[in-house]
Amino acid sequence: SNAENRAYYVPVPANRDEALKIVNEFRPLYENENSMKVGQNIKYDMIVLQNYGVQVKGKLFDTMLAHYVLQPELRHNMDYLAEIYLRYRTIHIDELIGSRGKNQKSMRDLPPEDVYRYACEDADVTLKLKNVLEKELKKQSAEHLFYEIEMPLVPVLVNIESNGVRIDTE
């Protein structure tokens, strides 16, 4: 999503070679240092993209992390944040694929229109939350903590989770 109430969905096939072709079309956007990337748990998205050789660059804004900075004692999932800040009930993932367990479906099992609606809503709600939480960070004088301390740790954690950490046991 690049504007509120407007989002796009590009299906990525399971076949890695075909998926890589699509990911490479968007590589310049992800690796553009001059554009902000917004996500809900953006670390997860960065790890997925890193698996395709994409290094996300530029300023980052994670709505989950922003809310953690503002109210660490509360839940930070998108469904909760949308209800609290936007007064909006999102499409819950378990409504589409079922509860965790052996009978849970994959997103690939769903009709494309269901995935489209879910993915576009996810992107749009995330951007709307960013716009609200950004103001809250400013109001609570938490911008420095968020932008200068918390967000710079995200790429570090991506690398640690992807590559591991060497430990000198001696």
Residue ranges and their predicted role:
Residues 2-138, 149-153, 157, 162:
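Active-site-proximal helix-loop-helix substrate-binding element of RNase H-like nuclease domains
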